[in-house]
Structure formats: C-alpha cells, structure tokens
A protein has these predicted regions:
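Glycine-/small-residue-enriched transmembrane alpha-helix faces in small-molecule transporters
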Residues: 1-32, 36, 78, 136-163, ...
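Cytoplasmic-side transmembrane-helix entry/capping segments in multi-pass membrane proteins
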Residues: 56-64, 111-123, 143-144, 168-178
Length: 286
C-alpha cells in the first residue's frame, strides 16, 4: 500500500499544471474534493457500510478536513502552478518535519534515536531538493509560502485526528472529510469566478477525472488508513519518498531539473524511509 501510495501521489504532481490550464485552483480542487468524497461514500454505501458519524465527532471531522484537505489541496495546487511542480511537492512534504514537532507537543510522542536519525535524513533530503529551486522561490515567494502552508495544514490535520480519532471506518471518515472540505472551496470557486462559463477540453476532463478518482479518493483513503495504524511522526515519515517521485516524474513529463542534488536527496529519503519502516531484530537471549 505504501509503495503504491508513493507512486500515485508522486506522479500526481506534474499533472497539476495540466489540470489548471483552463480551471482555477479553486474550481479544480472543488471538483476533485467533492467528486472524491462522493465516490468513496457511494462505494461505502454499496458495500453496506453505515455512513453515519457520531454527533460528538462532527466538529473535529470538520476542523481536520479544513486543516488538511482544504488548506493542503488549495495551497499545494496554487504552489504547483507558480513554481515547478517537483519543487512544490518538496515544500508540501516538509509535512513530516511539522508532524514530528506537533506530535511531540500535543500527543506526547517521544522520538526514538531511529526516528530522530530518519527525521535528520528526511530534512537533509528536503534541503537538497530545495537548493536548486531557490531562484524559483525568490521569483515566486507566494508559491514558496503556499507550499509551506500546505505542509503545515496537512501536519495539523494529521495530529488532530490522532489526538481525536473518529470511530468510523476509514472509507467513511475520508469520504466525509473530502466532501466537507469541498464546501468552502466550492463557495470561493463560485465567488471568485470571472468570465463566461465554458466546457473544458477533453484533456482537462480526463486529467481532473483521474486526479479525483485515484490520487484524491484512493490515495487519501490509503493515507488515512496508514495514519490510523501508525504513530503520527512515523506516518509522516512513511511518505517521505513522494517528493522524490514527484521530481523524477516532473523531469520525465515536463523536463523539470533532475541532477546530482536530486539523486543525493533520493538517497537521504530512502535512508529515512528504511529507518522508519524497517524495525531492528530483537537481540537473541543467551
């Protein structure tokens, strides 16, 4: 699941500029969030899974949805169209660093030596990926800020749900979060729309449909399933390879930079991932 999620999300980033050639970031995200939410809730219903959420948990569900899904999706989308998509992915995936800080502050999760080393390797990988894009960030500071905001929003939503878990199946929780987060984004899409209503091109429809069904619906379902099973800081580090895949796919699909810094970053991120998911064997007695 983790390997598939890494490739689904990593290869998703170069598609953002294609999706937003004709649509605003607000319209694109409103469509993909609402479509992904409706798809998951429909599948849950067809499988006979109750869609209800206990009344006491609706507030937290809404707050987490806005922090992660609304802030992350809008900010990352804006960042991806103002700076190279691979560089945007790197900024968004500073998320594990923010999760480590927030989970220590609010969840009391202690970072073991392996986690600290993985975090250091992950930070080194992110730094190596950031360096080639410094000029792009200087030319588009709002894109840089939006990328960092995306990572913070994702981290905040993850920690909230770890502290206040929603007692429903992951497919139901994910579906409602996608649908709830689409509402404020949809309102802004309508309010900020300028110009005549038009029918998007076939390419735009295909790209947005794919993003809605696979990275948005399936990807988020898998992410919430993983996040529910792992400590917050480990869950965050588990997706550290996504920006590396985004860089490689951006280079292949859009001719974005790929050189020694990216290769070194890949080695750092692979080391961080190995430390995170591979547990040492217990010492044998005697």
């Amino acid at each position: 699941m983790l390997v598939a999620l890494t490739f689904i999300w990593g290869c998703n980033w170069p598609l953002f500029p294609l999706a937003m050639r004709e649509l605003s970031v607000w319209t694109f995200r409103a469509v993909s969030l609402s479509g992904g939410g409706l798809l998951l809730l429909t599948v849950a219903r067809l499988r006979g899974i109750p869609l209800g959420v206990p009344r006491a948990h609706w507030g937290m569900l809404l707050i987490a949805a806005v922090c992660y899904l609304a802030v992350w999706n809008v900010a990352s989308g804006f960042s991806a169209i103002t700076i190279p998509s691979g560089q945007s992915a790197v900024l968004g995936f500073t998320m594990p660093l923010w999760v480590a800080v927030l989970s220590a502050l609010f969840l009391g999760e202690r970072l073991q030596t392996r986690n600290l080393l993985a975090l250091a390797l992950g930070a080194a990988g992110v730094l190596l990926l950031l360096l080639p894009g410094l000029q792009a960030y200087a030319d588009a500071p709002l894109g840089f800020a939006a990328g960092i905001l995306a990572g913070l929003g994702w981290a905040g939503g993850t920690v909230m749900l770890k502290r206040h878990p929603i007692p429903v199946p992951a497919i139901v929780s994910t579906g409602w979060q996608l649908l709830l987060s689409s509402m404020p984004v949809g309102v802004l899409a309508v309010a900020l729309h300028a110009g005549p209503v038009f029918l998007p091109s076939t390419l735009t429809v295909v790209v947005v449909s794919y993003i809605t069904m696979v990275p948005m619906a399936v990807g988020n379902l898998w992410w919430f399933s993983l996040a529910g099973q792992l400590p917050a800081n480990v869950a965050g580090l588990s997706v550290i390879m996504v920006p590396v895949v985004a860089m490689i796919s951006g280079a292949l699909m859009r001719g974005e930079p790929l050189g020694p810094p990216q290769v070194a970053a890949m080695a750092c991120c692979m080391g961080a991932l190995a430390l995170t998911i591979l547990k040492p064997k217990p010492a044998s007695a005697g």
